[in-house]
A protein has these predicted regions:
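A short, Lys/Arg-rich alpha-helix, primarily the initiator
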Residues: 2-26
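DNA major-groove recognition helix of helix-turn-helix
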Residues: 38, 49, 59, 67, ...
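Residue-level recognition of specific faces of alpha-helices
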Residues: 19, 44-47, 73
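Short basic helix-loop element that most often maps to the first helix and adjoining turn
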Residues: 18-34, 62, 96
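DNA major-groove recognition helix of helix-turn-helix/homeodomain DNA-binding modules
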Residues: 56-73
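Short alpha-helical DNA-recognition segment
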Residues: 28-47
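Interfacial/linker helices and their anchor residues that mediate assembly or domain coupling
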Residues: 71, 75-108
Length: 108
């Protein structure tokens, strides 16, 4: 299984969709084939790859097993996408994120 450390060294992914597309293309798979793994249609995989629609957390475990990659990396990108989508259009989004980061660091 490819570890989180190895995945970081592979490429610098910005989104889960980008990572999913790269993994699918590296394995010469069609979107519908990846969709079958997580029991969704190929159209949803297309939307995920284009960052138009998210997948559920439950899908990450299946994708991790199928592509033999660390589930933590998938969860990291999945959660980062969720956060980005919440704050991206907010005028104070980045400040709120930085504030939250500081608060979390102080709690631990």
């Amino acid at each position: 299984m490819e570890t989180l450390h190895k995945m970081k060294n592979r490429t610098n992914y910005q989104t889960l969709g980008e990572m999913l597309r790269q993994l699918r293309e590296e394995n010469n798979l069609m979107q519908r084939e990846v969709g079958a793994v997580i029991e969704v249609d190929g159209a949803l995989i297309s939307k995920v790859e284009n960052n138009e629609k998210p997948i559920n957390r439950e899908h990450l475990k299946k994708l991790s097993a199928f592509f033999e990659i660390d589930e933590d990396m998938l969860q990291l990108l999945w959660l980062a996408d969720k956060i980005r989508n919440i704050i991206k259009d907010e005028p104070l989004g980045l400040k709120a994120l930085n504030y939250t980061h500081t608060k979390l660091n102080n709690e631990h």
